[in-house]
Amino acid sequence: HERRFHRRTFGDQADDLTRVAVDTLRTRGVARLTRWRVRVTLHRRAGTSATPRLRSVGAMASRLPGGNPPTTRTTMRGQRDITVPRRSQMIHRGHYPQWGGGGEAWCSPTSTTMVLGHWGRGPRPRAYRWVGRRHRNPAVDYAARSTFDYGYHGAGNWAFNVAYANRYRTSSFVTRLRSLREAERFIRRGIPLVASINFGPGELDGAPISSTAGHLLVIRGFTANGRVIANDPAARRNSGVRRVYKRGQFADAWVGGSGGLVYVIRPQGRALPARTPEANW
């Protein structure tokens, strides 16, 4: 359906109180929201009877913390490392410029593809027969095409990525976690997370890139002393994707950087961690 319909957001939209930035509504100045409502409007081509199918609607509200959070102590009593396929976004550099051109532009669809691969989900090979024969991991190219935002001109739209994951019998959504302790609860349930981070030079030891204003990777586990085990798609090769990051540095890059934003992607019926007061899932 990508040939017939180009999914898109509509750029910056603003009034005196709020501003829409791609997939996020932000308040302006001192304005604060006390309640909100979501409306979905479905359209069909005039003169046809075909209609869209709406499977789920998701929205999430949050007030971002100021500055870097204090480092939380780990709750892990031993190492837990979930087996997640390793996929590098960089081996796709130069692929399909009309969908972002691979490389550094494809961290989100690459991370989404890794988690879908963990669950044994994703497109069947015939769906990506159009991908060049010499291209490794063609499901990543397919995911980039299927998540590309023709308004934003990128494949990193959070909502589009979880909507893509939901094609494959998953219950997926975007939320924010408050700390690595909450992420540990998902890992103990066997649920890897796609996390949004940003950091400056020297702020994340062992990262395959020196800095980033916005990047997505997979949290696949924790060491016994609380360090973060990640699949970082910015590695040059698939073999270098698995990384282990210092707990405090990662928390600053994730909670301090994006407010703890994650994609939660898991099969339908897979239980989430038990909810706590003010739960965010």
Regions found by a protein language model. Give the residues of each.
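Extended, solvent-exposed segments with strong compositional bias
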Residues: 1-23
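Active-site-adjacent structural segments surrounding the nucleophilic cysteine of cysteine proteases
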Residues: 29, 35-154, 280-281
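Noncatalytic regulatory segments and standalone regulatory/sensor domains
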Residues: 2, 9-11, 30-82, 222-281
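Catalytic micro-motifs at enzyme active sites that drive phosphoryl/nucleotidyl and oxygen chemistry
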Residues: 24-27, 206
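A generic signature of intrinsically disordered, low-complexity regions enriched in glycine/proline
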Residues: 27, 96-99, 165, 235-236
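Conserved active-site-adjacent core of cysteine acyl-enzyme catalytic domains
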Residues: 130-281
